[in-house]
């Protein structure tokens, strides 16, 4: 098997595109009316961030592709998960939590931990079809601090999905119906309290459809607007709600 030169490694190329940032405390602002309960469910799934880190650790202890940079990329992503957990906990500290949602999220966490799929494949599916709907939901229905955090995490997750999907593909690991069933149950729980709405960002069917498309095809054309979603202007945010860029 031909080994790629390190300079051409897709793994190293993907981590080179990351933008360093640091988690900082945020202030409590106003949430979009009608989306609050779902946002707290989405926030409760922050408890999956560190388990994703553990999935990557389990993957590092198994056979990996020989492509240069794969180990460095997985370790880099582990550090990101720690920062994501810290940033999301700052949101929880500012807004409080829904204790019922927090408890139910533990059952979801248990199901993902116990699923027998390859750990890096599980990380890929979680990030691609769950985190990639949670994050835009938070950007369109959260306050300044939530939008800032979700935008920064989203940039990391783009690299994560690319890296973890490539690892799974090189290992010949594919998601079956069992993993899809768990993905669907997780998405149903997140968006269960939404109904049908003319505002697609508060429409249950819209979000469930995006999760399904991301699982099946790896893309969701209807989420293209998130690339242009309202980003936080510096004049609209107190300093405590802005990320700290630079060496993390």
Language-model-detected regions and their locations in the chain:
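Non-heme di-metal
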Residues: 1-248
